[in-house]
Amino acid sequence: MILFKKIIFVLIFFILGACSSIPKNTQNSCAIFEERYLWYKHSKASYEKWGAPIHLQLAFVKKESDFNWLAKPPRTKLFKVIPFKRPSSSFGYSQAVKGTWEQYKRETNSPLATSARFKDSVDFIGWYIHKTNKILRISKKDPYRQYLAYYKGWGLSLIHI
């Protein structure tokens, strides 16, 4: 019984240790990477794989989730009081909607990827920026149009660009 309790304690410790808190200073990329060195490695890997600039990856994460790994869109209100449905299925650092996230997992052969992991989220953002560059011919260095395509989707972006 004591061994069982120790095992449970160790499991809880590792599970809670894996949960990532929001960085103290989300306005400064150097401070973020100083606090979370692995995030720099993950962002750099996404840059090397997809060509998506690191500052653009961080800007997307900041705008979409403010570095909150559990971020979800706010619920709509029924009769202006009762919490109701969420307007979309977006979740995690990247706030990717379910359909696009599933497409990413299929195309990158990453069946275990989750948007609650920073590594997977910045890889997704890199993939999305790369695909936007190929589909809509938007430069990877054009943050305004890249974010517009990220926010609106590839189909709706054609109307505004």
Task: Annotate each PLM feature.
Residues 3-10:
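Sec-dependent signal peptide recognition
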Residues 20-78, 130-137:
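Export/targeting segments at the very N-terminus of extracytoplasmic proteins
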Residues 32-40, 49-54, 72, 86-94, ...:
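Solvent-exposed, acidic/flexible segments
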Residues 69-110:
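Mid-chain, structured segments of secreted extracytoplasmic proteins
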